[in-house]
């Protein structure tokens, strides 16, 4: 026989707070959820994300492993 009263209480209208404001309601086992970041203020979703690439990942890799950046991919596959 299944045990009774083992499941947590379910709150179908749990409020999600960000910076003291209710940003959405969700279903949860807690009545209130406090978050620092959500899709409404995250730079990726708001379009304010800045990509900072000071050196260039490919150039850094090529320099680190002593490969020349003038060699094309077609020359590498002929081997």
UniProtKB/Swiss-Prot annotation:
A GO cellular-component term linked to this record: ribonucleoprotein complex
InterPro entries, per database record: Ribosomal_bL28/bL31-like_sf, Ribosomal_bL31, Ribosomal_bL31_A, Ribosomal_bL31_sf
Query: SUPFAM superfamilies from the entry?
Result: L28p-like (SSF143800)
Q: Which Pfam families match?
A: Ribosomal_L31
Q: Ion transport: is it a keyword of this entry?
A: no
The similarity comment for this entry is:
Belongs to the bacterial ribosomal protein bL31 family. Type A subfamily.
Q: What is this protein called?
A: Large ribosomal subunit protein bL31
What is the species of this protein?
Nostoc sp. (strain PCC 7120 / SAG 25.82 / UTEX 2576)
């Amino acid at each position: 026989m299944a045990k009774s009263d083992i499941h947590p209480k379910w709150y179908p209208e749990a409020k999600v707070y960000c910076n003291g404001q209710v940003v959405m309601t969700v279903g949860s086992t807690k009545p209130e959820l406090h978050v620092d970041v959500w899709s409404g203020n995250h730079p990726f979703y708001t379009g304010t994300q800045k990509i900072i690439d000071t050196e260039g990942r490919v150039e850094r890799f090529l320099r680190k492993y002593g490969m020349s950046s003038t060699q094309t991919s077609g020359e590498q596959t002929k081997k």
